[in-house]
């Protein structure tokens, strides 16, 4: 741990030596909301979940299958779509994209690479939590972040739509 701390301190010192202090920096902000569909369980999944959980309360669920079935029942009651808030701040030439969920690293990197003006970094879990928001190709791989439960409820094409909205916000900034 001492070696890591030393390496980190040396890197911070190296970077801060090149910083130029200014007391005047431009601040800008843009925000929007977009509507995304909720991935709801099928009627057959809801029927199977009800049968599995018949007569049992939430404190009686013991297996992952039972917990997942309960989540299917809860998700079935969600609205068909949700309003997703997005914000971007600009501090000088630094842009801060605020995602209301947990994005994958590749998603943040793609938005950074598409940024035409200045530097960009991403903040997840800002202004809400709409679960994991995996890119479309991750859904085919089937990891837990993609399971259609309350922790990953947005449509499979959410990331391209969010990227597009963020790019529009970036271009709205003066």
Walk through the language-model features, giving the residues of each.
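Non-catalytic substrate/cofactor recognition surfaces at enzyme active-site rims
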Residues: 1-174
């Amino acid at each position: 741990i001492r070696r890591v701390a030393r390496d980190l301190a040396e890197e911070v010192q190296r970077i801060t030596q090149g910083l130029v202090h200014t007391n005047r920096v431009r601040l800008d902000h843009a925000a929007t909301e977009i509507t995304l569909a909720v991935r709801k369980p099928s009627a057959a999944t809801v029927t199977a979940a009800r049968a599995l959980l018949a007569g049992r309360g939430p404190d009686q669920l013991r297996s992952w299958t039972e917990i997942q079935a309960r989540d299917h029942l809860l998700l079935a009651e969600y609205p068909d779509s949700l309003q997703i808030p997005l914000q971007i701040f600009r501090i000088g030439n630094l842009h801060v994209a605020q995602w209301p969920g947990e994005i994958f690293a590749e998603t943040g990197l793609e938005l950074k690479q598409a940024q035409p003006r200045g530097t960009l970094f991403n903040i997840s879990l800002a202004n809400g939590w709409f679960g994991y928001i995996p890119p479309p190709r991750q859904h085919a791989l089937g990891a837990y972040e993609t399971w259609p439960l309350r922790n990953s409820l947005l449509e499979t094409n959410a990331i391209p739509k969010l990227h597009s909205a963020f790019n529009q916000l970036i271009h709205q900034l003066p």
